[in-house]
């Protein structure tokens, strides 16, 4: 975990991926730093301090989700994104709001499990190599077939067999040492062997996914899992592939799942972040039965946000110290349309601004994962070096901004559409082009995009 970052350092890290939106970055940076501060307090005071939940308000495509996602990734905290519109009131068919907490715990378990696997990786690989040696050179017990029970009982021919057994053991030991040496040198990587692996079975949980009955599926699966033995099947694989499978199996045996569960539940409770998107879609004044149902979802979310215990397959999980970040465009409604109790649970309000053409220019070139860097790297795999002139980048940004103004404003996501259309022909013909370097000029951008951008009816369908 990396909770030691100062708010300024967190903002600097977020700047590497997200352009603008300083207020939102500052809000999440302070929220993260407060978690670090809280961890330093004495226990009785620490229990009294709950995180201040954040409500992000802004149009689509301005970075609401990205800010929260990058924030969680930065500190390695369990993070999930859910959509408020996917939930239904308790008693109706669909997902209940408690499933977001169960999903968070599942994410936390996966993170902790991956960390534990890395810790035991060397030992797991060592044991996997021993299993490979055993498969390639079986021990005498496995090689020998039927033994005369009378001979075993009365020790007949015991003396005469001892010498031959000792010689056989020596020969096998030499073979095993030779195979170990070859495995270490990587000389047997392509050798095909037959191994037994644990069969992956489709779970009850998978069948009930999205029906609102996931918890029942998980409980049923656990009950069956403790009774039914695990199935194995034989597979023919190269030594290289077999080592990966066997290493994974050995790692799963080496890690203590009780320890994983305990740490995962702790992280979910103390460090977990739940991002609730589209919260504006469940806001609104009561006017019909649909709105009543939306208010019901808000009332179901309320106890989760203010702190309650949720039953999961890993035990009861407290939601008191989970950080909730809600977001919405609030085009058709406003934050005050949420029920007052829920409004009070999101004391930090942050408004994200619309993106300008200048912001689009920065988005195209400045972030570590900038779009132009992505497309340049993709086409470089075909042996083509692509260069965008500054004027061409400005032209792309202006066209994307103008299309947003003329049609629906989808923020930075418009750049993906524009870039795909711009490089469509080039991407299609890349494997056949003999030129080593191609420069994208404003004229090329104009030729590919300007006509479509100017025609409002066409741009609605293409851009």
Curated annotation (Swiss-Prot):
Region (Disordered): 154-175
Start-end of Polar residues biased regions: 156-165
A GO cellular component annotation in the UniProt record: HslUV protease complex
GO MF, one annotated term: ATP binding
Keywords: ATP-binding, Chaperone, Cytoplasm, Nucleotide-binding, Stress response
List of residues binding ATP: 19, 61-66, 277, 341, 413
Location of this chain's protein in the cell: Cytoplasm
Main location: cytoplasm
Intrachain disulfide bonds: none
Classification via Pfam families: AAA (PF00004), AAA_2 (PF07724), ClpB_D2-small (PF10431)
Chaperone is among the record's keywords: yes
UniProt xrefs under InterPro entries: AAA+_ATPase, ATP-dep_Clp_protease_ClpX, ATPase_AAA_core, Clp_ATPase_C, HslU, P-loop_NTPase
GO biological process: protein unfolding; proteolysis involved in protein catabolic process
Parts of the chain that traverse the membrane: none
Described purpose of this protein according to its UniProt entry: ATPase subunit of a proteasome-like degradation complex; this subunit has chaperone activity. The binding of ATP and its subsequent hydrolysis by HslU are essential for unfolding of protein substrates subsequently hydrolyzed by HslV. HslU recognizes the N-terminal part of its protein substrates and unfolds these before they are guided to HslV for hydrolysis.
Protein family membership: Belongs to the ClpX chaperone family. HslU subfamily.
Family annotation (NCBIfam families): hslU (TIGR00390), PRK05201.1 (NF003544)
Binding partners and assembly: A double ring-shaped homohexamer of HslV is capped on each side by a ring-shaped HslU homohexamer. The assembly of the HslU/HslV complex is dependent on binding of ATP.
Protein name per Swiss-Prot or TrEMBL: ATP-dependent protease ATPase subunit HslU
Naturally occurring in which organism (per UniProt): Bacillus mycoides (strain KBAB4) (Bacillus weihenstephanensis)
Protein's gene: hslU
């Amino acid at each position: 975990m990396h909770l030691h970052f100062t708010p300024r350092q967190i903002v600097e890290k977020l700047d590497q991926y997200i352009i603008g939106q300083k207020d939102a970055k500052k809000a999440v940076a302070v929220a993260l730093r407060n978690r670090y501060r809280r961890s330093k307090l004495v226990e009785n005071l620490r229990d009294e301090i709950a995180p201040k939940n954040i409500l992000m308000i802004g149009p689509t495509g301005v970075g609401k989700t990205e800010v929260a996602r990058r924030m969680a990734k930065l500190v390695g905290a369990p993070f999930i994104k859910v959509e408020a519109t996917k939930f239904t009131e308790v008693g109706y068919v669909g997902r209940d709001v408690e499933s977001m907490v169960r999903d968070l715990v599942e994410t936390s378990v996966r993170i902790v499990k991956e960390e534990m696997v890395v810790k035991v990786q060397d030992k797991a690989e060592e044991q996997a190599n021993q299993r490979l040696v055993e498969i390639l050179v079986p021990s005498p017990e496995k090689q020998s077939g039927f033994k005369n029970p009378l001979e075993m009982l009365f020790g007949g021919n015991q003396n005469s067999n001892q010498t031959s057994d000792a010689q056989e053991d020596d020969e096998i030991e030499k073979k095993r040492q030779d195979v170990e040496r070859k495995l270490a040198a990587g000389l047997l990587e392509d050798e095909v062997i037959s191994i037994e692996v644990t069969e992956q079975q489709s779970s009850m949980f998978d069948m009930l996914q999205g029906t609102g009955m996931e918890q029942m599926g998980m409980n049923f699966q656990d009950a069956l899992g403790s009774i039914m033995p695990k199935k194995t099947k034989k597979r023919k694989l190269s030594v290289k592939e077999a080592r990966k499978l066997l290493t994974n199996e050995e790692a799963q045996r080496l890690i203590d799942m009780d320890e994983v569960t305990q740490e995962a539940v702790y992280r979910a409770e103390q460090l977990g972040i739940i991002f609730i998107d589209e919260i504006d879609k469940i806001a609104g004044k009561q006017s019909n039965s649909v709105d009543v149902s939306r208010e019901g979802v808000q009332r179901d979310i309320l106890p989760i946000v203010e702190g309650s215990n949720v039953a999961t397959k890993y035990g009861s999980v407290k939601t008191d110290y989970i950080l909730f970040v809600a977001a919405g465009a609030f085009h058709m409604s406003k934050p005050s349309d949420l029920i007052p109790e829920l409004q009070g649970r999101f004391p930090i309000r942050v408004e994200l601004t619309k993106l300008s053409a200048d912001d689009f220019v920065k988005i195209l070139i400045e972030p570590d994962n900038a779009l132009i860097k992505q497309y340049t790297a993709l086409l470089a795999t075909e042996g083509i070096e692509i260069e965008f002139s500054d004027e061409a980048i400005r032209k792309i940004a202006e066209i994307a901004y103008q299309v947003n103004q003329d049609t629906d404003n989808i923020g930075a996501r418009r750049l993906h559409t524009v870039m795909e259309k711009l490089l469509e022909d080039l991407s299609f013909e890349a494997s056949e082009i003999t030129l080593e370097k191609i420069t994208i000029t404003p004229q090329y951008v104009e030729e590919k995009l300007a006509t479509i951008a100017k025609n409002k009816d066409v741009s609605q369908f293409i851009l």
